[in-house]
Amino acid sequence: MVMTDPIADMLTRIRNANMVRHEKMELPASNIKREIAEILKREGFIRDVEYIEDAKQGTLRLFLKYGASNERVITGLKRISKPGLRVYAKADEVPKVLGGLGIAVLSTSKGLMTDKEARQQQVGGEVIAYIW
């Protein structure tokens, strides 16, 4: 069976693992998933990312992050631009998530970046997901 939206699958796997408080999770790798995982690590939503090479496409292992009393760091993930309905934002219309408490992941002409980085570089693009 062909997966129509691998990014939504990634976000759902993270959400499910986070809900049951798994320490780590694995998912099939791709370049865009790897970039999203690196953004999550850089922004402090996950502890670490490992790429595991295999004969096929490889695997990403994400180490989820929890607070001191085991509270979730990631409280929500939402796919915005979908294969059936793409959502774009101009440079001056880049959205803020929860008043700046969360991040929006954008695919721009300069690569994948957060909403803060897109505003600093004054670029717009496709709004991939919201994470808070």
Swiss-Prot record:
GO cellular component annotations of the record: ribonucleoprotein complex; ribosome
Q: A Pfam family this protein belongs to?
A: Ribosomal_S8
A GO BP entry: translation
Q: InterPro entries in the record, alphabetically? A: Ribosomal_uS8, Ribosomal_uS8_CS, Ribosomal_uS8_sf
Gene3D superfamilies the record matches: 3.30.1370.30, 3.30.1490.10
Which is an annotated GO molecular function term of this record?
Answer: structural constituent of ribosome
Would you say which domain of life the source belongs to?
A: Bacteria
Keywords, A to Z, come to: Ribonucleoprotein, Ribosomal protein, RNA-binding, rRNA-binding
Give a short account of what the protein does: One of the primary rRNA binding proteins, it binds directly to 16S rRNA central domain where it helps coordinate assembly of the platform of the 30S subunit.
Membership in a protein family: Belongs to the universal ribosomal protein uS8 family.
Q: Which HAMAP family match?
A: Ribosomal_uS8_B
Its protein name is: Small ribosomal subunit protein uS8
Instruction: Give the organism's phylogenetic lineage.
Output: Bacteria, Bacillati, Bacillota, Bacilli, Bacillales
